[in-house]
Amino acid sequence: MSSIAEQLAAASSLNQVTVPDLWQQEAVTALRAGKDVVVQAPTGSGKTLIFELWSKQGKNRGQAIYTVPTRALANDKLAEWRARGWDVGIATGDLAENLDAPVVVATLETQKNRLIRGDGPVLLVIDEYQMLGDADRGLNYELAIALAPPQTQLLMLSGSVANPQDVVKWLIRLGRQAVLIRHEHRPVPLDEVFANNLNFAVPSSVRGYWPRFVTKALADDLGPILIFAPRRQGAETLAADLARQLPPPPHPLDLRVDQKQMVGEHLAKLLRS
């Protein structure tokens, strides 16, 4: 007969329990007290869990709009929460579905007119709020925050803002009650490497900063490599340049049909080349 400890360990419901850290509990407590919350915490530390706890796993009273910078991120969140059985809608530039759901994942620009009308949700989540500093989209983010009606609480999440305290001061100047929750521990270590310290001799046939840098990094076994570009066109141009100049891998990637549909035919061809 198994011990009580073994029975508890085998209980699937217990294996799925997530116990929030103190900083996450503080953020949820502040939200439930009616305050705006600005969260500064590293990637992978559990910022999204704050919203999930506040919403009681998608069973929140009143609507919450969870905004993300890109349509791809919106689709990811939609799929994740629907897989858990949540009633979730989506609003992006090219898709609007189930907009009366308790939780709607959206790009922020789709909500601007609603906020201007004063028709805000109970909670507006701005994930990756460092977009305030974006040269092209920052104005839309600033307007959305400044025009959010008093009855709409704000939850602003980021891991890459150097001065979150100034954002809190700005919210207070707007007449809002705002607090800063800061968490410094990084669950995924981050090491900085200077490009000049990579000593691999790149062949002269490889030209341009990024192709030469990626060649050096791969030679030092620093892959996989993820490069961010401000726009899709820039990302595709860079991907094409890298695919053209870097030596091909011994086994080009053979994507499944669903993977080809996800990345698009253009990028699928690059991966095969």
Predicted regions and their residues:
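Conserved C-terminal RecA-like helicase domain
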Residues: 65-67, 72-78, 82-90, 233-273
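Conserved pre-motif I regulatory segment
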Residues: 1-40
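Residues immediately C-terminal
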Residues: 73, 128-132, 163, 234
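Motif I (Walker A/P-loop) of helicase-class P-loop NTPases
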Residues: 39, 46-56, 137-142
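Conserved interdomain linker/interface between the two RecA-like ATPase lobes of SF2 helicase motors
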Residues: 143-147, 152-155, 160-248
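SF2 helicase catalytic motif II
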Residues: 108-110, 116-155
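Conserved nucleic-acid-binding Ia/Ib motif block in the N-terminal RecA-like helicase ATPase lobe
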Residues: 61-113, 169, 179
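Short hydrophobic/aromatic beta-strand immediately N-terminal to the Walker A/P-loop
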Residues: 37-40, 65, 155, 226-228
